[in-house]
Every structure is written in C-alpha cells, then in structure tokens.
A protein has these predicted regions:
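S-adenosylmethionine
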Residues: 1-473
Length: 473
C-alpha cells in the first residue's frame, strides 16, 4: 500500500530535470569566455559552433540563433545592464557574473529578438537551471518576469536620462556605448544629434563579411559566383558575402588567393598605393603588418608594378600569420619579426611605407562589440608613445620624395590627428598630402587632407589615414 500524504499538505511535485538547450548553453559558454578570459567573440564562437556541428547538435538555424544571442547580447550590454539594474534589489556589481550573463541573454531575447516573451523566459530559466542550479534559477525567473513587463522602447523611457538633461548619458544608455566613447566619437564626428545617433546605431548593426580578391591571384568575378554575393561599395577588389555567409566555404579564401578584409582596410592600402611619388617605386614597407590583411593586398599591388614588399611585425606568432597571408604572392616579398621602433633596416630605404598602428580599436566596435566595455580612457595614454614612435620610424624609413601612410582603426582624435600633428612638428622635411583624390568615387571624406571613414556613411570600419610626403633631407 502506498504511503498517503499527511492530511492538509499537498503532495510534493516530482523533481523534473532541466531541459538542456544546446544553442543557449553554447551562447552562455561564449559569453563566459569573453568575460572570464577577455576573449573576443569572433575568436571564441567559431570553434564552439564547429564542435557543436561535428557532434550533430546544430544545424544552420541553430548556429544563426547562437550567433545572434552572443553578438546581440554583447552589443546591447549597456542598455540591458540598465534594464536589469532596475529589476534587481542590489547593485549589479553584487550579482554574480555568470548570473548576469544569463540575465543578459534573457533580456536580449525579450527586448532584442522576436522570440515570444513566455518562450524567452522559459528557455532562459531552463538554461539557468542547467548552468547555475535551481536556486539561482528562481532569481533569474523573477527578474526576467519584470523585464518582460515592457518592450525595449518602454524600458529606455524608464532608464535613460532625458536627452535635453544629459545628451551623452542618454545616448550611452540608448545605444549601449560607454559614455566616454560616446563623447570621443562625437568629438571626432562633429555635427549634431542625428549624425552621432546614426554612428552609434551603425556600431550595433551586424556587418556583412567582406572579401578582398588579391590582385593577380583572384578576381571579383570569381568571388561573385558565391550565392547572393555583391560587389563592394568602394574598393574594386571587394565582394560582400550574403548575410551569414561563411568565408571558409569560399575556395579562393581557403587557398589564400582571397581573404576577409573590411573595405575600409582595403581603401587604406589602395590610397597609399595610388599616392604619386617622385622617383623610383620599387621598395615598399608594411611596418605593422600583423595579422597580414593589408600586407597581402599591398604585396599584390606592389607585384603589379614590379616592386618588392617588406612586411615587419614585432610579435613572432603574428609574423607567422603575415607569412601565411603573403604565401603565393606573385611578386618578391619578405616577412620579418622586428620591433618597429628599433628597425633593422637603414633610414631612407623605402619608397612607400604603411604603419597601421596599435590603437584602441574604437572604429571596429561593430565587429568586436565587447571592446567597448574593455577599453578605458587611460588606454589612450598607453598607446600614445608607441603610436608616435612608429610614425617617427616610418618617416625615418622613407626616402626623400617617398610617402608614408599613418593608419588607425580608431577615429579618436588623440590617436589620429593629434599624433600626426605632434610628430610633424619634429619633421620640417615632411608634409601632409591630400588623400581624398586618391579614392575616386568615395564621398563624404571630410575637409582633408586626411581621411576618416565611418560605418554609417561608408559602411566600413572607422578607419583613419593620413598620407605624408618626405620633402627634403
């Protein structure tokens, strides 16, 4: 005879094991790697997806959802933090990071996707049971039910300060950027509210993959045979893959004849290659060559003119990536591991020199959304001496009549015009040349003579380029 429950007490519900959702577990694992190891999602996610596909757990739709959950959560982290903070009874710093990652994943499903609210809450609570345990899953459930009470616009009205009272803080919450980044980008861009809002919104868009057909090795016609591929907007060597396109599936990419390269990066190389020279044009230098994208394009362009490229990179493992990118280059080239501030070559050895210097990366936030939360204003002070030293080396390395290209993937004025202006004070034998005519057809390049590209205007990363000619000894 079965034992009867005591009178007046409801029978306990049988314990139900949590349902394991491989998509959300993978997304959580990726976010934990980004948080714990300072990893980048674009490096962490592909191997996780590949492993899941090999196990048979994933199809293409699963991979697309996992990718959206990871990148969407990282891009809107600032907004979601403000919403979650309004729904908990403690400061966010007192919420365990794994719990906050689960809450952020849930907030993105509720506020940033079309997943129905009940499904988003239920799936995220099940995830919490798997990765956090039943106790903390109850906390997740309570918080997400509060988040689900309004949509994104409604929450922004509640948690963002009015624009008229604090424009930068308002934009920081609405567009999910640290306040100091909003301020810096606004200073660089100039103009009123519309422009900065468009730029910040573009940072939160998922960019399509752009390929470069390396001259003499691949053609855009070949790359355009990929399904739904389109010509690039500006570069004659650029092809954009379809949404969700996998570059590893493209034969020319696998063979190294083409590569993944943002169109802004291609334009930097093209502008330097197109700059008029006085005298010979036989020796080119990429002084900060890792990981090799610009070096591979420069090497191919140099080969078309019978010029040789020296690609120098300080870190040996990155120099190895440069060598891999240049393998098969149709013209002469050499890759070395060397300190660009103490180079082994003689002064005046080169006709064209590119230095794409280490920087904060604030121009590539749409590709690396987590970078906006890692960078600090003091990073500018850390980069400044190196940026100036590398530009000085470049100017010492170019011959009279030759051209130096100073490039960054940051539009911050402290990393762009301030560096160039400071260094040129020490070089009366060097002058800025107008880079804008060297990119025919590319509009909205500013007042010159330097170039600043923008995601919302050009569909590229926010690359900066100044071209400098050595005029006399």
């Amino acid at each position: 005879v079965s034992e009867q429950p005591r009178r007046g007490r409801k029978p306990a519900k049988p314990y139900r094991r949590p349902k394991k959702d491989p998509v959300r577990i993978l997304a959580f694992d990726a976010l934990r790697a980004v948080d714990e190891r300072d990893a980048y999602a674009n490096l962490v996610l592909p191997p996780l997806l590949r492993k899941a596909r090999e196990k048979g757990d994933f199809d293409a739709r699963d991979a697309a959802l996992a990718t959206e959950l990871v990148y969407g959560t990282l891009r809107r982290q600032g907004t979601y933090d403000a919403v979650i903070a309004a729904c908990v009874d403690r400061p966010l710093r007192e919420v365990d990071p794994p719990v906050l990652d689960v809450l952020s994943l849930g907030a993105h499903q509720l506020l940033g996707t079309r997943i129905p609210s009940h499904a988003a809450v239920s799936a995220t609570v099940e995830l919490a049971r798997v990765v956090l345990g039943d106790g903390r899953a109850k906390f997740v459930n309570a918080v997400l039910r509060k988040v689900a009470q309004d949509d994104l616009d409604g929450w922004i009205e509640k948690v963002a300060p009015p624009y008229d009272e604090d424009p930068e803080d308002h934009l920081a919450v609405v567009h999910s950027h640290p306040r100091w980044v909003v301020s810096a980008l606004w200073d660089s861009l100039g103009g009123g509210r519309a422009g900065i809002e468009e730029l910040l919104a573009a940072d939160n868009e998922r960019p399509r993959v752009t390929l470069v057909a390396r001259p003499g090795r691949a053609t855009t016609e070949e790359l355009l045979r990929e399904e739904a591929a389109e010509p690039g907007r500006w570069s004659p060597y650029a092809v954009r893959l379809a949404e969700g396109g996998e570059p590893g599936a493209v034969e020319a990419v696998r063979e190294g004849r083409a590569g993944v390269q943002d169109e802004g990066s291609q334009l930097v190389a093209l502008a330097l290659a197109n700059a008029p020279l006085e005298g010979p044009d036989a020796r080119w230098l990429d002084g900060c060559a890792g990981p090799g994208g610009k070096a591979a394009l420069l090497g191919a362009l140099a080969a078309e003119r019978g010029a040789a490229l020296l690609a120098s990179e300080k870190q040996p493992h990155r120099a190895g990536l440069v060598a891999k990118a240049l393998a098969g280059n149709p013209g002469p080239y050499q890759v070395i591991a060397a300190d660009g501030t103490r180079p082994p070559w003689r002064p005046g050895s080169f006709d064209r020199v590119l230095v794409d210097v280490p920087c904060t990366g604030l121009g590539a936030l749409r590709r690396r959304p987590e970078a906006r939360w890692r960078r600090r204003p003091e990073d500018l002070d850390n980069f400044a001496p190196l940026q100036r030293a590398l530009l000085r080396t470049a100017l010492d390395s170019v011959r009279v009549g030759g051209v130096v290209g100073y490039a960054t993937c940051s539009p911050h004025l402290a990393e762009t015009r301030a560096v160039v202006a400071d260094v040129l004070k020490q070089y009366p034998d060097a002058e800025l040349i107008d880079a804008r005519p060297l990119l025919p057809g590319v509009d909205q390049l500013g007042e010159g003579p330097d170039i600043q590209l923008w995601p919302h205007l050009h569909g590229t990363d926010a690359m900066y380029l100044a071209l400098i000619r050595k005029t006399a000894d």
